[in-house]
Design a protein with these regions (language model features):
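Conserved catalytic-core motifs of GNAT/GCN5-like acyltransferases
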Residues: 125-128, 140-161
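Helix-turn-helix
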Residues: 135
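Conserved N-terminal entry element of GNAT/NAT acetyltransferase domains
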Residues: 1-19, 169
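Conserved GNAT acetyl-CoA-binding A-motif
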Residues: 114-127
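Conserved G/P- and acidic residue-centered "switch" motifs that form tight phosphate/ATP-binding loops
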Residues: 101-103
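Acetyl-CoA-dependent GNAT
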Residues: 15-96, 107-109, 113, 117, ...
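Active-site-proximal loop/turn and secondary-structure-junction residues that shape catalytic pockets
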Residues: 92, 128-130
Length: 169
């Protein structure tokens, strides 16, 4: 550790391995940002991805410490029945590793993946509640803009905020 703060040296982003699923679910749960149902759905999604969704263009990348320990992951995929629209479904960074540019790194990788596969824009959605203000600030900071807001989408008083980034620029 340099100056008491962990560095990002030696971290590698690569294809998610089936043996990492439990660790990734634990990372997401450990952030304190996701509801119990969302965590359960994530576990199912990762198993489905490994079983079949990877053949449909869904991509899951894990960011690992030099020793191989997962510190984050990004899950992104083409939107069904569209040409060039992709979704950034999951972006998770270990609670203790946030603020070190790791989320930005994974988003940039997801953008590059999608661009290579013909995407012209990438969408990300989040909640409009105060609790998710840091998430919305993150998307603003990495160049996404609000494309739409669906009032009361998740629950009364909990809007869905959809962010978009044009990948052609």
């Amino acid at each position: 550790m340099a100056g008491g703060k962990k560095t990002n040296q030696g971290m590698k982003l690569g294809r998610t391995k089936p043996g990492e699923f439990d660790a990734l679910v634990a990372l997401a749960a450990g952030t304190g940002m996701f509801k119990k149902l969302e965590i359960e759905v994530l576990g199912e999604l990762l198993r489905d991805w490994h079983a079949s969704l990877a053949t449909e263009g869904h991509l899951c990348r894990t960011l690992r410490e030099a020793d191989g320990t997962p510190v984050g992951f990004v899950y992104h995929a083409p939107a069904v029945m569209t040409k060039g629209t992709w979704h950034l479904y999951w972006l998770v960074v270990d609670k203790n590793a946030q603020g070190r540019g790791l989320g930005r790194r994974m988003v940039r990788h997801a953008e590059a993946d999608a661009r290579k596969l013909g995407a012209h824009h990438l969408l990300a959605e989040t909640s409009g509640t105060a609790r998710y203000a840091p998430t919305r600030a993150f998307y603003d900071k990495v160049g996404y803009s609000v494309e739409a807001r669906v009032r009361d989408f998740y629950a009364p008083g909990d809007d869905q905020v959809i962010y978009r980034k044009d990948l052609r620029r």
